[in-house]
Amino acid sequence: MAKSSMKAREAKRAQLVAKFAEKRAALKAIISSPTTSDDDRWDAVLKLQALPRDSSAARQRNRCSQTGRPHGFLRKFGLSRIKLREATMRGEVPGLRKASW
């Protein structure tokens, strides 16, 4: 079980990403545009660097919704492999069952 502070930190990061997503996208478009002048590009780079570090989507970590476990996360279900197996064995995941061949 992950510490509650880690879960809270990830929730805060998710909020920051959502809050600054539009601004980051606009600045990145200016930076990557070939028609932008060097001065405008440099200003956009400085503004992008001034944004909060945690507002970058790359800093988010996928975590299990039940335990907060960061490894063995299955995106399709939002659970770690351990909790997914437990839920499957209880029959709580429709269409999913233990393989047998």
Curated annotation (Swiss-Prot):
An MF annotation (GO) of this entry: structural constituent of ribosome
TM helices/strands, residue ranges: none
InterPro entries, alphabetized: Ribosomal_uS14, Ribosomal_uS14_bac/plastid, Ribosomal_uS14_CS
Example of a GO cellular component annotation carried by this entry: small ribosomal subunit
A Pfam family that the UniProt record links to this protein: Ribosomal_S14
Record GO biological process: translation
Keyword annotations of the record: Ribonucleoprotein, Ribosomal protein, RNA-binding, rRNA-binding
Cited Gene3D superfamilies: 1.10.287.1480
Oligomer and partners: Part of the 30S ribosomal subunit. Contacts proteins S3 and S10.
Family of this protein: Belongs to the universal ribosomal protein uS14 family.
Task of the protein: Binds 16S rRNA, required for the assembly of 30S particles and may also be responsible for determining the conformation of the 16S rRNA at the A site.
Protein name listed in UniProt: Small ribosomal subunit protein uS14
Organism annotation: Shewanella pealeana (strain ATCC 700345 / ANG-SQ1)
Name of encoding gene: rpsN
